[in-house]
Amino acid sequence: MIKRLVDIGAVKFGAFKLSSGLESPFYVDLRSVLGEPELFQWVIERYEAVLSGLEFDVIIGVATGGIPYASVLGYRLKKPMGYVRDEAKGYGTGRQIEGADVAGKRAAVVDDVLTTGKSVLNAIRAVRASGGEVAGVVVFLDRGQCGAEAVKREAGVYVYSVYKMRELLEELRPHIGEERYRSVLDYLSQWRC
């Protein structure tokens, strides 16, 4: 199934500018997984395995990449689900968290990919501002660019990942060629967390 991530373009190699502003020789866009039912199921099962080690009352998806995964996980695990907007909306209820109420509850924050940790830190702040506690953050992929360390340092919350980029890269190695493998490995080696 790992090779399917490359086949459908969920993992791409080349020259990319990330939303964080960083330049990268690879790009991960797990939204394309949503159009592949078998692969989507496989990804959800990996999330479930990681979440099974966490005690939580509610699942909170990070907009936008974490929302579809959090939705399915909430349904499958029979947990209330909500999501965090980038910022509180300026109309209606003015809430930043939609869906499940987090007040007095332990939340598992779910996102797809972690780079710098900025989006996840925003979600943690929103959960806490709404009276909730964060039991942990679960991502499918930690790019290995110090985001998990930033979340731990700044918020005191541990990030659990299905894959770290180095692990994913190792599994993809036979499918992407040695030159591409080395290029990404060299890029990742600059991040000392």
Curated annotation (Swiss-Prot):
Catalytic reaction list: orotidine 5'-phosphate + diphosphate = orotate + 5-phospho-alpha-D-ribose 1-diphosphate
Binding site for 5-phospho-alpha-D-ribose 1-diphosphate: 85, 89, 111-119
Known pathway: Pyrimidine metabolism; UMP biosynthesis via de novo pathway; UMP from orotate: step 1/2
BP term (GO), one: pyrimidine nucleobase biosynthetic process
The EC number(s) this enzyme carries: 2.4.2.10
Cofactor(s) of this protein: Mg(2+)
The keyword rRNA-binding belongs to this UniProt entry's keyword annotation: no
Uppermost EC category: transferase
Molecular function in Gene Ontology: magnesium ion binding; orotate phosphoribosyltransferase activity
Superkingdom as given in the UniProt entry: Archaea
Keyword set, alphabetical order: Glycosyltransferase, Magnesium, Pyrimidine biosynthesis, Transferase
Positions that bind orotate: 115, 143
A Pfam short name: Pribosyltran
Subunit organization: Homodimer.
Function as written in the Swiss-Prot or TrEMBL entry: Catalyzes the transfer of a ribosyl phosphate group from 5-phosphoribose 1-diphosphate to orotate, leading to the formation of orotidine monophosphate (OMP).
Family per similarity comment: Belongs to the purine/pyrimidine phosphoribosyltransferase family. PyrE subfamily.
Name of this protein: Orotate phosphoribosyltransferase
Gene: pyrE
